[in-house]
């Protein structure tokens, strides 16, 4: 897997938690970084609006080829003044192709289907990016739209819906799914593709169970005894710009001279999770793209053997069109680093420069900044103008300092001291 995109809704947004999460990484981000960083992924970007959270994790190998990373959010709750509902997006250029991920939480309740569509259109209209070629969400080559879209199953009664689910006859419910119904009428929705709903409706469940809602609906002052009708509220759709008309019914795009296409490999829910009244949904996609460039903007390497006994050198070179800045810097990272600010130390490319030629520039890092314990590390060049990593070195070893090595050896000797051997009954003499 090359990339993980995670959209959460209804994350704890109490004011104390929210303010704390603004200053520090929220618990969900920390959890996912703890899982993914040992596997060679870093958090490329994230955006949060109250209870909506969107995270993108990417394999190291792709980082130098991802550019123009921007985030956006749109509030639609309380007439646009409150962010309990709305959409958050992360867009980027991946090997030269513009891709956008949009996580939405749309209005609830079966009678609000039109409001859901209105809010989605509002999000599409209001989110503008500072890019002449790709200013709007629908201008991106690929758009993934997902989240708690809150569309319900219309017309059918709760008993028919539950009976159809019990018999795994989900197809009986598809034509009355409000999103499917809207796609038949709304032209802009017809450009979006979704895999078949071959899993149970993902809402509403009793907590910590796979049993559909057994409690009455809570109104302003009391429970009215009416139970929620199951629905596919949690969805993943995608749109390929100007290619939707070439899509086959199973979601694959027709072959030809296309430089980019999307294939859905699976689309499933996960019934074992019970911390919410929704069941999470995942989609696994194959993204076939023809790279518009294959050379990183910056190539950098550590010079010689690195240890904490001496200053160390970094050599780097850039392509001619690279928009360098005096605010660019090179970070030293452990190979399991979590995000771009998770560096051990860094050097300013201008202030710490010691030599420069037409082809190669060298900067130094003081010996005092080098980790004494050593280990496996890598270097990343961060571009201020691009607000992203423009180059990454191969992993390399930093040798432990003599002091660190002696300390480790002494500890091993202490751990190696054993009690005198007591012969076992059958030891031979």
Where are these regions (language model features)?
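Residues immediately flanking
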Residues: 8, 59, 149
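Acidic, serine/threonine- and proline-rich intrinsically disordered appendage/tail regions
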Residues: 401-429
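Structured beta-strand-rich core segments of catalytic domains in phosphoester-bond hydrolases
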Residues: 11-100, 107
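Catalytic lobes of large eukaryotic enzymes
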Residues: 34-39, 102-107, 111-407
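Short amphipathic alpha-helices and their capping/turn segments at secondary-structure boundaries
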Residues: 1, 89-91, 134
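N-terminal, active-site-proximal structural segment of metallo-dependent hydrolase catalytic domains
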Residues: 1-46, 52-54, 112, 120-124, ...
